Amino acid sequence: MCPLHNLDYEHYLPIFMDGLRCTDNPFKFIANQAVKELIDDARGNEQIITDTVDSLILPIRYALATKEPGTVLSVITILKQLCRVHPGVGPLLIPHYRQILGILNLFYCKSGKNLGDQMEYGLKPDDLVVEIAETLELLEKTGGDTAFAAIKFMVPTYTSAFAQL
């Protein structure tokens, strides 16, 4: 076994991030766990993450483009983890908000649907909306001064997390 910090993050992290859009198990599970563990292992050396942010945007965009609620939830969990690993990641994501937040806006505006007498099983849309709201707040808090304007441009119904203070 090779220690994770010895891996080439610029090579492996985008590959595993691209695997998030897989719907078949065990591939989806392996990709999800690999991304989480690689990001967790980089906590001591944040430069690794800041160097790979640009190469992660395309796999994130492709995964969000599937519009599968489970995949979207996995991606926003990873986005939150990326923002928490190092304060410098937030400002690096701002130029890419146009590619990422458009799909999140579709889910953010969908608070639920009328099913009549039927029941819906699985991930509830409201749960996904709450997770997206938390992600947008974290992106605003870690993104700096221009983050709110960039988020508001892509998600017009978003209200500032700082307005509640």
Task: Label every model-predicted segment.
Residues 108-128:
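Acidic, Ser/Thr- and Gly/Pro-rich intrinsically disordered linkers and low-complexity segments
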Residues 29-30, 95-109:
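Conserved long hydrophobic alpha-helices within structured protein cores
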Residues 16, 20, 34-42, 56-64, ...:
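Hydrophobic residues within the alpha-helices of tandem HEAT/HEAT-like
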Residues 5-16, 46-60, 90-101, 148-152:
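Core helices of alpha-solenoid repeat scaffolds
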Residues 1-30, 151-165:
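N-terminal "cap/leader" segments of large eukaryotic alpha-helical scaffolds
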